[in-house]
Amino acid sequence: MAVTFTDLHTADGLKALEQHLSGKTYVSGNAISKDDIKVFAAVPSKPGAEFPNAARWYDTVAAALASRFPGKAVGVNLPGGGAASSAAAAAPAAKDADEDDDDLDLFGDETEEDKKAADERAASKASSKKKESGKSSVLLDVKPWDDETDMKKLEEAVRSVQMEGLTWGASKLVPVGYGIKKLQIMLTIVDDLVSVDSLIEEHLTEEPINEFVQSCDIVAFNKI
C-alpha cells in the first residue's frame, strides 16, 4: 500500500516521515528507489536533530545523488547549511510526478532483464552504425527576486526561451519562506544541441528575463 507524505516543509510533515523511517534505511524496500528520490525532492533541507531518522535518511540519499552526479554544482544554494550536496524543495504534484516518471527516474532497481535489454540496444546501435545524440532530463529551481515578483509572468518568461533541442516539461510553484515561492520546472535537452550552463547564464539570468529571475539552480541532471 502506497504511503502518502504531505507538507514535508513543515514540522508536522517531517514528524510523519521520521515515524515512517523508524527502523528503516529507505522509504520503501531495502535499496534506494524512486520513492526515496520523490520524497527527497519534497524536503527543502536536511531535517534537524529532532528528526534523527529523517536526517540520516536524507544524508544517505544525498550521498547517493552526489556519487551519481559528480562534478561542480552550478549556483546551488543550501538553506540551513546541511551536509547534503544539494536538496530540491517540494516535488511536483503527484499527477505530474506520475506523468513524468521517466524524466524523474534518477534511480531504479536494475534487473537482469533491464541489463539484457540495454545490451541488446547497444548492440543494435553499433551494428547499424547510427549515431544518435543523447538526451538528458533536468530539474531546475528558478528563484524570483522577492515575494512581489509575478510568478505567472516569471514562468512565461522562462518558457519563452525556445531553441532546438530544448523541451520544457511539468512545473510547480514551491514555497521557500517569507511568502516567497520558487518555480520548479522540468526540461529535456538534446545534449549536443543544448548546454544547461549556457541556458542559465545566457538566457534565464540575462535581460529581459532577469527582471523576474534572480537565480537558477540545477537540482537534478539525468541522462536518458
Swiss-Prot record:
SUPFAM superfamilies tied to this protein: eEF-1beta-like, GST C-terminal domain-like
Keyword Protein biosynthesis listed: yes
Keywords of this entry: Elongation factor, Protein biosynthesis
Annotated GO CC locations: cytosol; eukaryotic translation elongation factor 1 complex
Purpose: EF-1-beta and EF-1-beta' stimulate the exchange of GDP bound to EF-1-alpha to GTP.
Assembly and oligomerization: EF-1 is composed of 4 subunits: alpha, beta (1B-alpha=beta'), delta (1B-beta), and gamma (1B-gamma).
Protein name (record): Elongation factor 1-beta
Organism, as annotated: Oryza sativa subsp. japonica (Rice)
